[in-house]
């Protein structure tokens, strides 16, 4: 599974910029770069240094680019191989020219995520740490970045390894009892001891799963729909949160005829904000399409921001919207409180039941702090603490933790039924294997290939 050839790729985003980087990794990385580099002898310079020089096109013997070359010798590198990073001028022409010259020397173009995959296969990081690399790149808030950094640092890995070790010692103890019953110096593993150990690990997994939803929110963001009758201030709400005009705000009801999306950071919680067309019955075919799409978005949302107009009584359409969001997670926003009151607030609270109700005058920027607090408090109690918490944010990890927990509960049930110890240990071993998939110890080659294929090229 481990390729040993030298690979290369552009490691910086496509487009114009001050600097672009062509990365190489493999046993021939330094040798090949030295063949196209005019400057100091790269094979003799100290590791982890950067050298100024020029890239020479072997085909024309002309200067192709002025560069700074970083030399890093394995195993003290990300991939644990020799690594070279050619820093050239930004822009597609310059960086592609350097890449073409490197490829012409026989270096293979890297597959997506192959540098990180090599780091994993060489034991530099485990699978959960490798996945955290991509989470870090995709992080949309400081809190999400903090969670990814801690996972990259091995916080989750160390906990999983500790729990797996406890299960492994338990299984090994049982096997010694079964295979070598004559060993009097080895205490027999009783059903009570096995149940106690299984419960201890199960409880630790349960703690992780209890805050897993919060971790998933920090990683992926909340799909948040803004709903309400036309002209109640939905676009004004989005504009206030995004702090730039993404939707046209007019006095004509029904202006927003399509789905408008934007990511926003609300007190560390990433929201994928969706401004829907006003949900109402309409004869306008174009608007009706937008309304149908809005209803679908509603069903798929994690959170709904339901906007009402302080300047108008509660309408039949408003009441239908309350019916539509019944059983869903939503916050009621009473907007336009700077105008004359026509809305019965007691009636609104009766329809909202125990859901949060926030008053705003968005065009006057009033009530925004209270709204942001209500959003954060809906999913997090108080300030979001990423310092001492071990968050599980990856859906794959969450599913495996659930399976590991269930396997231990199966073992505990077997003990209650008086099943033989060698049968009970099968479920304990299953739990150990499920946790091993998180860090890659028991993951299949096909799973590993599939995970790394989701990475960006050059990472």
From Swiss-Prot:
Keyword GTP-binding among UniProt keywords: yes
Molecular function via GO: GTP binding; GTPase activity; metal ion binding
Chain positions recorded as Mg(2+) binding sites: 235, 256
Gene Ontology biological process terms from the UniProt entry: tRNA methylation; tRNA wobble uridine modification
Keyword Membrane found: no
Annotated compartments: Cytoplasm
Role, per record: Exhibits a very high intrinsic GTPase hydrolysis rate. Involved in the addition of a carboxymethylaminomethyl (cmnm) group at the wobble position (U34) of certain tRNAs, forming tRNA-cmnm(5)s(2)U34.
Record text on subunit structure and interactions: Homodimer. Heterotetramer of two MnmE and two MnmG subunits.
Protein's recorded name: tRNA modification GTPase MnmE
Organism for this UniProt entry: Oceanobacillus iheyensis (strain DSM 14371 / CIP 107618 / JCM 11309 / KCTC 3954 / HTE831)
């Amino acid at each position: 599974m481990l390729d040993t050839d030298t690979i290369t790729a552009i490691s910086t985003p496509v487009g114009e910029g001050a600097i672009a980087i062509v990365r190489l990794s493999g046993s021939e990385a330094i040798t090949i770069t030295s063949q196209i580099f005019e400057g100091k002898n790269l094979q003799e310079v100290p590791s982890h240094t950067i050298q100024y020089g020029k890239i020479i096109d072997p085909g024309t013997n002309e200067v192709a680019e002025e560069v700074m070359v970083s030399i890093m010798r394995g195993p003290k590198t990300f991939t644990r191989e020799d690594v070279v990073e050619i820093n050239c001028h930004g822009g597609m022409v310059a960086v592609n020219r350097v890449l073409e010259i490197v490829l012409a020397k026989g270096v293979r173009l890297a597959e997506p995520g192959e540098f990180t995959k090599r780091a994993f296969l060489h034991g530099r990081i485990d699978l959960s740490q490798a996945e955290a690399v991509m989470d870090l790149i995709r992080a949309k808030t400081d809190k999400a970045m903090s969670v990814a950094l801690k996972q990259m640092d091995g916080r989750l890995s160390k906990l999983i390894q500790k729990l797996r070790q406890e299960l492994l010692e338990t299984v090994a103890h049982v096997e010694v009892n079964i295979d070598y019953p004559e060993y009097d110096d080895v205490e027999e593993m009783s059903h009570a001891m096995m149940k106690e150990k299984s419960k201890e690990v199960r409880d630790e997994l349960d703690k992780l799963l209890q805050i897993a939803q919060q971790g998933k929110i920090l990683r992926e963001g909340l799909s948040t729909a803004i709903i309400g009758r036309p002209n109640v201030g939905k676009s004004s709400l989005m504009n206030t949160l995004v702090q730039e005009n993404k939707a046209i705000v007019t006095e004509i009801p029904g202006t927003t005829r399509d789905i408008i999306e934007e990511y926003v950071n609300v007190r560390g919680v990433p929201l994928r904000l969706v401004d829907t067309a006003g949900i109402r019955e309409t004869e306008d075919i174009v608007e009706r399409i937008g309304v149908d799409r809005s209803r679908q978005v509603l069903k798929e949302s994690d959170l709904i921001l339901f906007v009402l107009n302080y300047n108008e009584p509660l309408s039949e359409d408003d009441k239908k919207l309350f019916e539509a969001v019944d059983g869903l997670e939503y916050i009621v926003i009473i907007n336009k409180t700077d105008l004359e009151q026509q809305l019965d607030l007691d009636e609104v609270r009766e329809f909202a039941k125990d859901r949060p109700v926030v008053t705003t005058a968005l065009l006057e920027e009033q009530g925004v702090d209270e709204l942001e607090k209500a959003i954060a408090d809906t999913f997090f109690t108080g300030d979001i603490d990423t310092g001492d918490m071990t968050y599980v944010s990856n859906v794959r990890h969450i599913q495996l933790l659930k399976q590991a927990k269930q396997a231990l509960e199966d073992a505990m049930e077997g003990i209650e039924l008086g099943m033989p110890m060698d049968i009970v240990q099968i479920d304990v071993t299953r739990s150990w294997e499920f946790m091993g998939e998180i860090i890659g110890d028991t993951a299949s080659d096909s799973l590993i290939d599939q995970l790394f294929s989701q990475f960006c090229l050059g990472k």
